[in-house]
C-alpha cells in the first residue's frame, strides 16, 4: 500500500484554501500514513516510530508541537503524530521500500525507452516527407483521368444504366496512377533503396495494394461510407457497377470504417504503410533477416510514437489494433488480386497493377 496520497487527489486548494499539517500546523502536502501532514512530520514519523527505543520527554509530555517548536521535543511530536491518527502499519519496511523504488526506477527506464530517439524522429520525418510528396496529394489528381460526369456530384443518385466502360477506364487509370505514386514513395526511402532490386520488387508487389488502401482511408467518410477524392465522390455502387462482388466490398468497407474510427493523422498512416512495406514474408524475398530488422525498427517507432501522442491518440490498445488491421489487409490483398483477374478486361487495362497482383 502506498504511503503517500498527493494533494492532486485531495479537494482543490482553489476551492477550500491551503490545508495545514494536523501535527505542527505547517502547510500540508498530502495524506501520509493516514493523516494530513507536512513533509517534515511525514519524514519524522517514518524515522522515529520504527526505532526500538522511543524518545522520552523531560517535561512529562506537555510540550507544544508547532512549526516553530516541533524539533524541540521528539517524544511529544511522536505522541501527537499517533494521537492524530498516523499509523505505523502503513510504513513500508526497508525491503518493501527498496522494492517500490526499484519498480519506480524500472517505470522511469521504460518510459525513457519509449521516447523517440533523434534517429527515430528523423526516420519519421523521412517517411512523412515521402508520403506528403507522393501519396497525400494523389487523390486530388483523380479528376485528370476522364471521370464520368456523375462522379462530380456528392449527393447524386446512382445511375445503374450508365455505360460501364467510361467508369471501368477511369478506375483502371486511377489505380495505375496510385501504384505509380506508391512506387515513388518507396523509392524516396533510403532504407528501401538499400535493399537489392529483386527484394525491392518483391516487397512492392506484396505491399502496393495494402499501402493503397491505408492511404485511401484518408478520403473515407464514416457518415456516408463514400470516398471523397478532390471534387469526385466514389460510392460502393460504383465498384459494383465495375464488377466487384459485394462480399469483397464489404471487407473493404469494414476495414476502412475500423481504421477511420482510430482518427489517425499522416505520420501514423506513413508508419503503417512502412510496416506493410517491410514485410519479410513476402514471396521472392531473399534478405529476410535485414527486412525483418527494418520492420522491427518501424514497429518500435510506431509504438513509441503512439505513446508520445497519447493525449491525441485516445484509443486504448491502438498499436495492437493497427497490427490487427495490417493482418486484415493481407486478406483484402489476396481477395483484391482475385477480383482484378475475375473482372473481364480489367487486368489488361492496367498491366502494372495486373503484374503486382500476379
From Swiss-Prot:
Alphabetic keyword roster: Activator, Cytoplasm, Cytoskeleton, DNA-binding, Metal-binding, Nucleus, Phosphoprotein, Receptor, Transcription, Transcription regulation, Zinc, Zinc-finger
Record note on modification: Phosphorylated at Thr-48 by PKC, dephosphorylation of Thr-48 is required for nuclear translocation and activation.
Gene3D superfamilies: Erythroid Transcription Factor GATA-1, subunit A, Retinoid X Receptor
Sequence ranges assigned to domain NR LBD in this UniProt record: 119-358
GO biological process terms, semicolon-separated: cell differentiation; intracellular receptor signaling pathway; negative regulation of DNA-templated transcription; negative regulation of transcription by RNA polymerase II; osteoblast differentiation; positive regulation of transcription by RNA polymerase II; regulation of DNA-templated transcription
Protein family according to the UniProt entry: Belongs to the nuclear hormone receptor family. NR1 subfamily.
Superkingdom assignment: Eukaryota
GO molecular function annotations of the record: DNA binding; DNA-binding transcription activator activity, RNA polymerase II-specific; nuclear receptor activity; RNA polymerase II cis-regulatory region sequence-specific DNA binding; RNA polymerase II transcription regulatory region sequence-specific DNA binding; sequence-specific double-stranded DNA binding; zinc ion binding
Coiled-coil region: none
The name this protein goes by in its record: Nuclear receptor subfamily 1 group I member 3
Highest classification ranks of the organism: Eukaryota, Metazoa, Chordata, Craniata, Vertebrata
Residue ranges: DNA binding: 18-93
InterPro entries named among the record's database cross-references: NHR-like_dom_sf, Nucl_hrmn_rcpt_lig-bd, Nuclear_hormone_rcpt_NR1, Nuclear_hrmn_rcpt, ThyrH_rcpt, Znf_hrmn_rcpt, Znf_NHR/GATA
Subcellular location: Nucleus; Cytoplasm; Cytoplasm, Cytoskeleton
Record PTM Phosphothreonine, positions in chain: 48
Comment, domains: Composed by a short N-terminal domain followed by the DNA binding, hinge, and ligand binding/dimerization domains.
Keyword ATP-binding: no
Subunit structure: Heterodimer of NR1I3 and RXR. Interacts with PSMC4. Interacts with ECT2. Directly interacts with DNAJC7; this complex may also include HSP90. Interacts with CRY1. Interacts with CRY2 in a ligand-dependent manner.
GO cellular component terms given for this protein: cytoplasm; cytoskeleton; cytosol; nucleoplasm; nucleus
Amino acid at each position: 500500500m502506498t504511503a503517500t496520497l498527493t494533494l492532486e487527489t485531495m479537494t482543490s486548494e482553489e476551492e477550500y484554501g491551503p490545508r495545514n499539517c494536523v501535527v505542527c500546523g505547517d502547510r500540508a502536502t498530502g495524506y501520509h500514513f493516514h493523516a494530513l501532514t507536512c513533509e517534515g512530520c511525514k519524514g519524522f514519523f517514518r524515522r522515529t516510530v520504527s526505532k526500538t527505543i522511543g524518545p522520552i520527554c523531560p517535561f512529562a509530555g506537555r510540550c507544544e508541537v508547532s512549526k516553530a517548536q516541533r524539533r524541540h521535543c521528539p517524544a511529544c511530536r511522536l505522541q501527537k503524530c499517533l494521537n492524530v491518527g498516523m499509523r505505523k502499519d502503513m510504513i513500508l519496511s526497508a525491503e518493501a521500500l527498496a522494492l517500490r523504488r526499484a519498480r519506480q526506477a524500472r517505470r522511469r527506464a521504460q518510459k525513457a525507452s519509449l521516447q523517440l530517439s533523434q534517429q527515430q524522429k528523423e526516420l519519421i520525418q523521412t517517411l512523412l516527407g515521402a508520403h506528403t510528396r507522393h501519396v497525400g496529394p494523389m487523390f486530388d489528381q483523380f479528376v485528370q483521368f476522364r471521370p464520368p460526369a456523375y462522379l462530380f456530384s456528392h449527393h447524386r443518385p446512382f445511375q445503374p444504366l450508365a455505360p460501364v466502360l467510361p467508369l471501368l477506364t477511369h478506375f483502371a487509370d486511377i489505380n495505375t496512377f496510385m501504384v505509380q505514386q506508391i512506387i515513388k514513395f518507396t523509392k524516396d526511402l533510403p532504407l528501401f533503396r538499400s535493399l537489392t532490386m529483386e527484394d525491392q520488387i518483391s516487397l512492392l508487389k506484396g505491399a502496393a495494394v495494402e499501402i493503397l488502401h491505408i492511404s485511401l482511408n484518408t478520403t473515407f467518410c464514416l457518415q456516408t461510407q463514400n470516398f471523397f477524392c478532390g471534387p469526385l465522390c466514389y460510392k460502393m455502387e460504383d465498384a459494383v457497377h465495375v464488377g466487384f462482388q459485394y462480399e469483397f466490398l464489404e471487407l473493404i468497407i469494414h476495414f476502412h470504417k475500423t481504421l477511420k474510427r482510430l482518427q489517425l493523422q499522416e505520420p501514423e498512416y506513413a508508419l503503417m504503410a512502412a510496416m506493410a512495406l517491410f514485410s519479410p514474408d513476402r514471396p521472392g524475398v531473399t534478405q529476410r533477416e535485414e527486412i525483418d530488422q527494418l520492420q522491427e525498427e518501424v514497429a518500435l517507432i510506431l509504438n513509441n510514437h503512439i505513446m508520445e501522442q497519447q493525449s491525441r491518440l485516445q484509443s486504448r490498445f491502438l498499436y495492437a489494433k493497427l497490427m490487427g488491421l495490417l493482418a486484415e489487409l493481407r486478406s483484402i490483398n489476396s481477395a483484391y488480386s482475385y477480383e482484378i483477374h475475375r473482372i473481364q478486361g480489367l487486368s489488361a487495362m492496367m498491366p502494372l497493377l495486373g503484374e503486382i497482383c500476379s
